[in-house]
Amino acid sequence: MDAIRRIDYSELVDVPKLQALMESFSEVLGLPNAVMNIDGKIIASAGWQSACTNFHRVNPETCARCLQSDTSLAESMTRGARYAIYRCLNGLIDAAAPIMVEGQHVANVFAGQFLTEAPDLEFFRKQARQFGFDETDYVAAISKIPVMP
């Protein structure tokens, strides 16, 4: 019996053109986005929030939360969900949908980080203190996250 060859999405697409598409998408909609393979490797991304790039993804504890949240969304896709919306463990919202090729789940497209209501600044101030972030800078970064009711 022949093993089914796992499709590598990054071999199927022109990655620089995909990157340009993701940048345009982010600019038009005002939302960060990414395409990740099923192993969680980022193929293309644009518009990430400074709360994530300057705080969450650089602190070991909050970065672990990011990875756990990404994994939870990706697992929803492997269980056959058409899409998933998830509040990450750092308090932000991400959405994802699977990319299928010839019936095989090969990657996920993510939109986010965003909020569905004005940020709970006390929650984020507490989080800043908990993880040693500069509270003023962190709250300023959180305040820039798009709200999509």
Q: Over which residues does each language-model region extend?
A:
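Juxtadomain coupling helices with adjacent low-complexity linkers
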Residues: 1-29, 107-149
